[in-house]
Design a protein with these regions (language model features):
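Short, solvent-exposed loop/beta-turn-alpha elements that line the ligand-binding surface or hinge
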Residues: 54-55, 139-156, 196, 250-270, ...
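C-terminal motif of bacterial Sec signal peptides marking the signal peptidase cleavage site
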Residues: 18-23
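Loop/turn elements at helix/coil->beta-strand transitions in domains of secreted/extracellular proteins
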Residues: 58-62, 88-92, 113-119, 136, ...
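Conserved small-residue motifs centered on glycine
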Residues: 67, 370-491, 497
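Extracytoplasmic/periplasmic substrate-binding proteins
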Residues: 129, 233-254, 277, 283-423
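Conserved N-terminal structural module of periplasmic/extracytoplasmic solute-binding proteins
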Residues: 8-10, 25-203, 255, 263-267, ...
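Sec-dependent N-terminal signal peptides
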Residues: 5-16
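Helix-loop-helix "hinge/cap" segment bordering the ligand-binding cleft or interdomain interface
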Residues: 165-238, 255-299, 303, 358-370, ...
Length: 530
């Protein structure tokens, strides 16, 4: 296992955090807990062997590191943890960094040594392929092939699972589809400006201009709003461009495979320079939130709820209901239009699904797969917990009124959000609209709101599936520094107004061209070896 490179280099695939964050030593396992980690890794990870279902030992304890897609403290994670332990008889320890810092803290945890690694983690995109390449993840291929879920007849996501295989092996399990982002526009703002939903980039830019210079919120003041906001000019994970698709269009800031089967770095192409020019022009005109560079997703959502801007590219499906509910709770008009992709964008991108992965230091990976991951889709009480939460905390069937809506005895409904009072929950970790296994007893099927269905339909009918980028030794070595440099170049051009020619001269002088070509060569070498 090549984890020694991680320990020495701090796991370059973590995309080189731009700020220092504290690690997770307080939740670390003791050294004795992983004394046999190397032996376990060699026997299970390298061979892909897995025990039969009836031979799997139930773990006494499972430690997981997760982001805020899993129940947070504010949403009574303690109640979730207690219920999970009641259902399994297993002690569950949850390590949960701030959502926007998750991959940074995870990288620091990996770099601190296998004795500190959790048993299971949530990964996505290049983080998944990178950690797999480094030997940090357990090969769960046979565990999945031998699982009760696969043979149950209920599983419908074979294409999703197959898309996550690396050289035919599965190192992480997706429990839902990947989903993606759709551009939402406040209808009232369009109406106030006398506009219709844009279908081209020129119309889109004209809308941003009107939302910035006019009076779209109808408060009688021109110019006290702006067009859009985003959590950075480039995402924190693949597909990188999903928060600003109208500006990127056909450009891509990282590695992709052409129709000819040859890998290339999209950052070095002319169409990426054109995308930078579009972003810089819109930013200079004031159409884009001046805090975009440092925004987190929560910052953007709060500004949207406060009616500071009118165009927000965010997740399809249940997030349409979340956005609507929060606008209403802030006293603003809540009707949103999910746009079809403008002509120059063509299609939205469905990201590769986030996965649950088991680290190679885990002493009982088969047990963790069975009792933690596979059980999430059991079509029963555990799936209920991961989808809707805890009864009488996050959902209920009692006769009551929630936010002015009366429910009868026995009628399933979601409770008022603990984190965002004035709104109702829509889901927990599992999104029922992205399900990859049938669940006949799903009590919340009828509770999915029309706006969520509409947004998901717009996305599903106008998206393409992203594919994972394989990792190589060169990718693991250079891509962290390369992405840091790329983000710096983008910030210089868009925010500081640096000329594109000067910015790309720095890209070459600071090593970007060399790193990029080295990675491209390694990807094409790997491709030709298939």
């Amino acid at each position: 296992m090549r984890v020694k490179k991680m320990l020495a280099a701090g796991m370059a695939v973590t995309m080189a955090a731009s700020m220092a964050l504290s690690g997770c030593s307080s939740s670390a396992k003791s050294g004795a807990d992983v004394t046999n980690a190397g032996a376990n890794t060699e026997s299970s990870s390298s061979t892909g062997e897995s025990k039969a279902e009836n031979e799997i030992k139930k773990p006494e304890k499972i430690t997981i590191m997760v982001n805020a897609t899993v129940m947070t403290k504010q949403n009574n994670r303690d109640a979730f943890e207690k219920r999970w332990e009641e259902l399994t008889g297993i002690d569950l320890e949850i390590v949960q960094p701030d959502h926007d810092a998750y991959f940074d803290v995870l990288g620091q945890t990996f770099a601190s040594g296998p004795e500190n690694w959790p048993d299971a983690i949530i990964l996505a995109g290049s983080f998944y392929t990178g950690y797999a390449e480094e030997g940090a993840l357990w090969d769960m291929t046979q565990a999945w092939e031998n699982s009760e879920l696969k043979s149950s007849g209920r599983f419908t996501g074979d294409d999703v699972v197959d898309n996550m295989k690396i050289d035919g092996k599965l190192y992480g399990f997706p429990v839902t589809r990947g989903n993606g982002c759709v551009t939402y526009v406040k209808k009232k703002w369009l109406d106030n400006c006398g506009l219709t939903a844009p279908t081209t980039y020129d119309e889109y830019l004209n809308m941003l201009k009107a939302f910035t210079e006019g009076d779209p919120d109808g408060n009688g003041v021109n110019g006290d709003t702006y067009g859009l906001s985003a959590a950075g000019f480039i995402g924190t994970e693949e597909p990188w461009t999903n928060y600003l698709p109208e500006f990127y269009q056909d450009a891509y800031p990282s590695f992709a495979k052409g129709e000819d089967g040859v890998w290339y770095d999209g950052f070095t192409k002319d169409n990426f320079k054109e995308a930078l020019q579009r972003m810089r022009d819109a930013y200079a005109a004031g159409y884009i939130d001046k805090e975009t560079l440092t925004n987190g997703t929560k910052d953007c959502r709060n500004k949207f709820y406060e009616d500071k801007f009118g165009v927000f590219t965010y997740w399809a499906g249940t997030w349409a209901s979340n956005l609507k509910n929060n606008l209403e709770s802030n006293g603003h008009d809540s009707e949103l239009i999910p746009l079809k992709p403008i002509k120059e964008v063509g299609t939205y991108v469905e990201r590769t699904a986030p996965v649950w992965a088991i680290t190679s230091s885990c002493e009982n990976p088969e047990g963790v797969f069975k009792y933690l991951i596979e059980s999430m889709l059991d079509g029963g009480e555990m799936e209920m917990l991961w989808t809707y939460g805890v009864e009488d905390v996050h959902w209920s069937k009692k006769a009551e009124t929630v936010l002015d809506k009366a429910y009868n005895e026995g009628e399933f409904h979601l409770k008022e959000s603990l984190e965002n009072p004035g709104t109702q929950y829509t889901k927990q970790h599992l999104d029922p609209m992205l399900a990859i296994a049938t669940w006949e007893g799903d009590p919340g099927k009828a509770a999915v709101k029309d706006e969520a269905k509409n947004a998901q339909t717009v996305f599903n009918e106008n998206c393409r599936q992203a594919t994972i980028t394989p990792s190589t030794e060169e990718m693991a070595t250079y891509n962290g520094d390369l992405m840091t440099l790329k983000k710096s170049i983008i910030a210089d051009v868009v925010v500081q107004g640096t000329s594109i020619d000067e910015a790309f001269k720095r890209f070459e002088s600071d090593g970007g061209v060399k790193w990029s070509q080295t990675i491209v060569d390694s990807l094409n070498k790997k491709e030709s070896a298939k």
